[in-house]
């Protein structure tokens, strides 16, 4: 049985046509959260057989396989350490939105991560936006002041 819930209801199967979802995990003890995405299926190219290789140019086929979404608990190392230490029962696993293309899932994830300022807010486990790592990015008072100036300018 999956630990995911959508609008309070348990999710055991993906909605028809959905590519993936954006989720929020919440630590029920300290209320820290994590916003991420998960695809329902993985896709890879099927290796060509020797016969196909020797035949010359052959179009490769793609294989779709269900991902580990039912058991998935996020990709943040700090989050996963907390889940191991505190127990999965101390976290809620909530699907926020479904996307019906890869682009929709990615857009939803990054949009929500920016909207909730997950990199600068200590209430979030996130250390990246989308798949981009901000390795050299440190949140300083100067950076926050610059962001406030831009925010004020844009209204």
Regions found by a protein language model. Name each.
Residues 1-155:
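Structure-specific nucleic-acid interaction/processing domains
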């Amino acid at each position: 049985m999956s630990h995911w819930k959508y609008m309070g209801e348990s999710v055991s199967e993906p909605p028809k046509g959905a590519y993936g979802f954006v989720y929020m995990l919440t630590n029920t003890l300290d209320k820290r959260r994590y916003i991420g995405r998960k695809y329902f299926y993985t896709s890879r190219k099927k290796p060509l057989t020797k016969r196909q290789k020797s035949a010359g140019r052959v179009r490769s086929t793609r294989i779709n396989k269900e991902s580990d979404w039912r058991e998935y608990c996020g990709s943040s190392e700090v989050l996963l350490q907390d889940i191991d230490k505190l127990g999965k029962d101390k976290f809620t696993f909530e699907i926020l939105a479904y996307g019906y293309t890869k682009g929709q899932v990615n857009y939803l994830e990054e949009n929500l991560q920016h909207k909730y300022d997950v990199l600068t807010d200590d209430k979030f486990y996130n250390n990246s936006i989308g798949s981009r790592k901000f390795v050299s990015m440190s949140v300083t008072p100067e950076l926050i002041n610059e962001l406030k100036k831009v925010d004020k300018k844009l209204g």
